[in-house]
Amino acid sequence: MEARTVSARPVEDSRPPDRGERAARGSVRPDVALLPKAHLHLHFTGSMRHATLVELAATHGVHLPDALVEDWPPRLHATDERGWFRFQRLYDIARSVLQTPDDLRRLLRETAEDEAAEGSGWLEIQVDPSGYAAKFGGLTPTVELVLDAARDAGAATGVGIGVVIAANRTRHPLDAKTLARLAVRYAGDGVVGFGLSNDERRGRAYDFEGAFRIAARGGLLSVPHGGELLGPGSVRECVETLRADRIGHGVRAVEDPGLLDRIVDRDVALEVCPASNVGLGVAETAADVPVRRLFEAGATIALGADDPLLFGARLARQYELVRGEHGFSDAELAELARQSIRASAAPDDIRRRLLSGVDAWLTTP
């Protein structure tokens, strides 16, 4: 079965309507794009605007397949090896258009602008510097470039930005240890967490325990992916072995009530990405993503967009899907926003400001 791409406004047309436009349409519920929130699950290349991808490809002479041009957003189904290979290939092609420091700076500036337009006051963007190091002088120069670009983007937009350094689970665990040591060097200087991404089926979480132990000793959050393409066993490894503070996706935990209870007891946040789950075939429709079940079980949830470049839906769309497909009330949407803020690494002053804004959103007509 081919997964359907979630219906969404084009990424470039994601500007929230102003109050006059909403009134003209007769909308009576608050606009989720105006709801203050934190965005905790966004990948670096995957955050790029589609128009920027096309423009940079033309500038640098990179040929884009139809799936990234005329047929964008692509139809994906990554629950089998062939489908994941196609997804990863499209991601790698998109990454190849980022060839100069200015390209990286532009990506982060535009991403921060899009976050601000959708109510996100704090962003944690995930990057594996190994994928960019060859072009930018090595791992350390790449990390320093990303951190400097993040500071500039934050200053220009008012969005706080933290960086999560992520290891690739398809690479050797020793590579992950190298990245963990590098991430710790910049703890307190922009790096807030250490992650583990890519295909769960090709790298078990327990193989990376050493890297996560290094990161934890350095004061970084543990934020591995799990429970997306594999079931609750993968989530359990993240919780028990990697001592996860948050889990990227984690939706398959709902299949094991005992595990879900443990997640709730430990207050491990789940970074749930509805549009991505549908786009990759983890769920057939947005209504099948178990957001309501996780929420009612008491799990902390932080909605995320994952890779809007490939799924065509940014952060506000995730809240719209939860509202429309799962019947979340405005009070429940506000609680989801609060949970995203509390699960973040945002400084206390940003947390207080965003939480106050959530309360104001609920009471503003």
What are these regions (language model features)?
Residues 2-5, 9-220, 229-234, 241-246, ...:
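Metal-cofactor-binding active-site regions of metalloenzymes
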